[in-house]
Amino acid sequence: MSVAFGSLEVAHLPARRGFNFPYALAVLSRQSNGNVYVWTAASDPADLNRPFLWMSVTKFLVAVAFWRQSLAAPALSLHTLVGSPTAAEVKLVDLLSHCSGLPFDAPMAAPGQPRLGVKFGIARPDARAIAPFTKRIYSNYNFELAGAIAEKVVGKPWTEWVRETVLEPLGMNGTVLSHSPAWGAVGPVSDLARLAGELLSPETGVLGFTERDLDGFCAPQHPGLRGLLPGYGPQKDNLWATGVELHGVKSPHYLPVSFPPEVIGHFGQSGSFIWVDRVAGAAGAFLGAQKFGPVHKALWPDLNAQIRELALLAQQ
């Protein structure tokens, strides 16, 4: 896959005018030959290389690493039974798709790992597990438990095997991993764009995915489960794939209602997002210095509509 970077003016994406804090974004467009063109923009040119907090967008990266690791190493099968503290039938894929029944936070956080669900008002301090496959409880605990399982199988800390599995092959050299596989990535928007570009054009990429591989990765897991999408409230069908969100019919949402239901993505409480429309050949990414709040909720749907429109116009 050839990735070519260019720059954008404010007029290309008018919704940018509403952001009064440091940010950087990327627009990706897949061409007919499989190459991916990337245009970037930022509040200041220096912010294009600035490492921003990804927070929960980390889950998107880690999910890709799990999928690749499961294809390359059958010992890390996503159908591995998890065991305690989950119900007997819960598998690794159920952790990644947030249908294990576990609460948002681990009951006892490790030193240096804050209970973010409590901190952000998403979860109660006394939250308990429920029966699996009855409700989709978005959960950092799921990813941290999955990361611990992978460490035992692979024999390396999650930071190391995710770096070797995804970051190094894609040249995501500015991204640093620490703390938690649910929220611990910090890096520039160019790295996030490289990740999105790999999923836009996998068969010309470097991770070895086929389109069929990604069809499996993006397939809905236990569709129809209601649940709370942090920042956006209750959803009748809080649709998820293997560690990445599916747009589905969620509303309200950071993606506009005009987006197809099969678009995958993730957003983070740091004010970050990534999404990939594999069918249309368009993708977008955003990182910023202001925590997710009213300005993001107000502007992101329009911004993402403009990103997708621009990406489609640029196709050759």
Q: At which residue positions do the language-model features occur?
A:
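Active-site helix/loop module of the DD-peptidase/beta-lactamase fold
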Residues: 54-57, 69-107, 141, 148, ...
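Short, charged, amphipathic alpha-helices and their helix-cap/turn boundaries
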Residues: 25, 29-40, 94-97, 102-132, ...
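Amphipathic, well-packed alpha-helical segments that form the structural scaffold of globular domains
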Residues: 125-127, 147, 197
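Well-ordered alpha-helical segments within folded domains of soluble proteins
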Residues: 60-63, 141-147, 190-194
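Solvent-exposed loop/turn segments at secondary-structure junctions
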Residues: 102, 143, 290-292
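Catalytic loop of the DD-peptidase/beta-lactamase superfamily, centered on the K-T-G motif
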Residues: 1-44, 49-53, 58, 135, ...
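Solvent-exposed, conformationally flexible loop/turn segments
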Residues: 49, 75-79, 133
